Amino acid sequence: MGEGREGYEILLDCFLKALPSEVVAGAVKRGSVVYFRVVHGKAVLMSRKIAVVGRVQGVVHGDKFTDIVLGDGNGTVTVRFWSEKKGLLEDKGLAEGSTAKVLGVLRESREGTVYVTPIAVQSVPDGYLEEFTARIREDRDFLATFIEKQRSTVDAEEAKPPIGRDFSEKR
């Protein structure tokens, strides 16, 4: 955990919830690795893994992969199903207008386009996007509060004098 200008940067090894409109804007590249980065309060959360929910706005079939475009009304993100992952897409029956939840990892194409490589895909009911949006806010509020409390505890511990004998006094 490092402290930057915006707050405490925390690298998470979990699926960080995100809206399609946040993914590309929040993508940060460190070396060859792409992270999703979100600032919430004093917490700067980062993860390669994301959970994203959106409405399928398009399906594009290519020779080596199939892309679905997920949107939330404010922006979109591409989910790329390489040939070995196409079964994930076909089994779910996703089509334009349906709502999907994708657990995946951020990647960047040779052209510099950020996309999600899916690990798991689920078709979800139409109202799920609104529920998911509310949960994102709740989760981020919780994490920011938790991090701030942890940081305050650490700061308080560091400010305490050492326990034991004071070796500075002369004998």
Swiss-Prot record:
It holds the Pfam family tRNA_anti-codon. It comes from the Archaea. This is Uncharacterized 18.7 kDa protein in ribosomal RNA operon. It comes from Thermofilum pendens. GO terms for molecular function: nucleic acid binding.
